[in-house]
Structures are given as structure tokens and as C-alpha cells.
């Protein structure tokens, strides 16, 4: 019967996997990785919070697609949290961690990836439902969208917890991987292959939908300009989604390939030398998504810009002396109109700075 090592610290497993964490995380490389990672995380928290707030405040975004887009932003926000936790529990500190704390560290990263991937799959279903009917938005109810979002997070949390639940190498040291010293190589193979397979499926689905919409758009009569403009609207959303999917595949595939090579026990692949740079590349995906949303969607860009504008103006107003009562009274007369605009179009900034 194999001996289990639940009470060991991580230095026991790192030493057996010949992973010298202390030497790798010193000097210039450590400073670069931590500085870039910190900047990425701050931007992730700020930009993805803006995306979520934009969807909440702007009625134009109160549709299934944008609710799912906000959930993808929430997954990116969670990825930032996971990376912050990683930065405080990595390098020389890694060897001092308990098994449970290391499981938590890695589980957060696995959960963030699964949440993003599952959310993209749900968006693919939503886009398929709407575009096959040549509609901008699907007829999913808010209740169904909420259930789908809950399902995404339930799957993500479960997948992140699978190694903790038993699929690990604590009782079979010879099966341990190198990059994840208490993950069994069989689990790494399963996890990476399933994710890569999901990538290929999503790419195939989106390419099929894209070609379908393009074919339908090209056969429309040139005399029905109104119909053309309505039918091209789904294509705009599709281009946004495909750009997001492309960025996701580019940023995550190298890291997954490295994990797969480690799972296959490739001794000559030198996976230890590239793992942190590929992790930064994966984190870059959460940085890129809000930029893609705002660049591809003019309404999203305008809403986010107005929110920043309003926040800056509110900050400046607090530093200024109060205005005279007549000015305040004249502004209050238009208050209801501003309120109405803010509900229908998102935050409204007053150009006069009041």
C-alpha cells in the first residue's frame, strides 16, 4: 500500500521534482515578473469593474449577450485575484506552503480559466440561438441567463477543486508532475486535453456561425438597406466575440501545451524555464478583454468613458467651494432629465463640471 503525505510541506514535493524555486525567483527576473504582474492586476481590477458597471447602468446592455459578457469580465476579475494570491505565495515562499494552501493557490488559477472557458461556451450557445434566427439578441429570459451564469461558476469551482478532492499524487509520489508537484500527471493530461478540445470546438462553432452570417448578409438585396443594417448588427457582435475568443486561445494555448508536455513527462522540454512567462501571457488575456470590448463596441466605449468622466468630475467638484443657491436651483430643474438619460444610456457627464 502506498504511503500518503498529507502532512508534508511543499519543500518535500519540490525537492522530489527537482524544482529549484528559490534560484529562479531572484534578481531581475523576479522584479520584472512581479512589477508586470502587479500592473496587470491593477488594470484588470479597474477595467473589468468598469465593464460590469457599464452593463448594470446602461439599459442598452440589458440583454443576454451583455449579461454573459459581464460574467466573462467577472471571471477576468477573479483571475486578477488568483494572480495576486499567487504572487504572495510563490517563489521561495512556495516551499514553505502547506499542501492545502498550495491546493488553494493552484485551484484559484484553475477556477479562473474554467470560468472563462465555460462562459465562452455559453456565449457560443447564445450567439448560435440568436444568429440562426438573424436576430441581434436571443430570447433567453433573465432567469435562464442567471441559471447559466450559476452553472458556469459551479463547473469552474468543481474543476478547480478536483485535485483537492482526490485526483492528486499525495499517495503516489512517482506519478507527480514537475510544474505542479502535487498534481498527478494523469490529471494534467486530462485537464489540458479537455481544455484544448474545448478550444477547437469553440473555434469551429464560431467559424461556422461567422460563415453563415456572412453568406446570409451577402445574398441580401441591395435595395433593402434597412434590412441589411439590421442583419449586419449580429455580425458586429460576432466579430467582438471572435476577437475575444482569438485572444483567449492565443494567450492560454502555450501554457496548456507546456502543462501537457509536463503531464507526458517530457524530460527534454525544459518546461520550468518558460512556465512563469506563459503564466503572464495567460494573465494578459484578462487585460486584453476590456480593451477589446471598448474598441469593438462603441456603446460600451462611450459608457465606460462617461463613467470615468463622471468620477473625475465628482472628484474635482468636492475640491471646489459650493456654488450660489441660484446656480444650484437652475441645475436641479434639469435633474430629472439627467436621471432619465442616465438610466437609458448609462452615466451622463456634465461638460460644465458641475
From Swiss-Prot:
Glycosylated residues in this chain: 15, 172
Q: By its UniProt entry, which Pfam families does this protein fall under?
A: 7tm_1
Stretches of the chain found on the membrane's Extracellular side: 1-31, 89-101, 168-186, 262-276
The coiled-coil regions, if any, are: none
Give yes or no: UniProt keyword Chloroplast. Answer: no
Q: Name one GO biological process term.
A: positive regulation of calcium ion transport
The disulfide bonds in this chain are none
TM regions (residue ranges)? 32-52, 68-88, 102-124, 147-167, 187-207, 241-261, 277-295
Composition-biased stretches (Polar residues) = 323-354
Which membrane topology term applies here?
Multi-pass membrane protein
| Residues on Cytoplasmic side | 53-67, 125-146, 208-240, 296-354
For this record, an example GO cellular component is:
cilium
Cell compartments where the protein resides? Cell membrane
Task: Tell me the tissue specificity.
Answer: Most abundantly expressed in testes, kidney, and lung, with moderate levels in small intestine, and low levels in heart, stomach, spleen, and adult and perinatal brain. Little or no expression in embryonic brain, liver, or thymus.
Q: Which UniProt keywords apply?
A: Cell membrane, G-protein coupled receptor, Glycoprotein, Lipoprotein, Membrane, Palmitate, Receptor, Transducer, Transmembrane, Transmembrane helix
The protein's role, per its UniProt record: Receptor for lysophosphatidic acid (LPA), a mediator of diverse cellular activities. Seems to be coupled to the G(i)/G(o) and G(q) families of heteromeric G proteins.
The protein's matches in PANTHER family, at most eight in alphabetical order, are given as:
G-PROTEIN COUPLED RECEPTOR (PTHR22750)
Q: What is this protein called?
A: Lysophosphatidic acid receptor 3
The organism of origin for this protein: Mus musculus (Mouse)
The primary gene name is Lpar3
